[in-house]
A protein has these predicted regions:
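N-terminal presequence-like segments and the immediate start of the first folded domain
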Residues: 1-76, 82-134
């Protein structure tokens, strides 16, 4: 499958990835978005809810991509750092809806890592993105 400058890499015979791509080939201008957490534009947390913080972090990514004239459709790689993988898994459906609401049906190569802690004490998730635009 190809979406312009991004080509999804799907090895022959593999089951389709659900909610992410196994790999992405990209060409164009690279954009690196630092790890975004679930606080607002004034660096204030409005919630301690995991899914709500994920939504805010995703919105922060979209806002940062827009500064480069890019959007979710340009994402090639996304890395999630979460404090509690069990909450991530148990709230997967809810999180999937929030993801599609903010990012649409754009699924980059994705990794999720559980970490012992994040720099900001109230942060429950941190997400970084690499994007490529023509």
């Amino acid at each position: 499958m190809s979406k312009g400058i991004l080509k999804v890499l799907q090895p022959e015979g593999w089951a389709p990835a659900k909610g992410y791509a196994n790999g992405i080939a990209a060409r164009g201008e690279m954009i690196f978005v630092a790890g975004m957490i679930g606080w607002n534009s004034q660096c204030q947390f409005e919630t301690d809810d995991f899914v709500a913080q994920c939504k805010q972090a995703l919105q922060n990514i979209v806002a940062t991509l827009a500064c480069a004239g890019a959007g979710p459709e340009h994402m090639a790689r996304m890395t999630w750092y979460v404090k509690d993988k069990k909450e991530y898994v148990s709230r997967g459906r809810e999180l999937g809806k929030v993801y599609q609401e903010v990012m649409g049906k754009n699924y980059p190569a994705m990794t999720l890592v559980q970490v012992a802690d994040l720099v900001e004490d109230r942060a429950l998730v941190e997400i970084e993105v690499t994007a490529v635009k023509p």
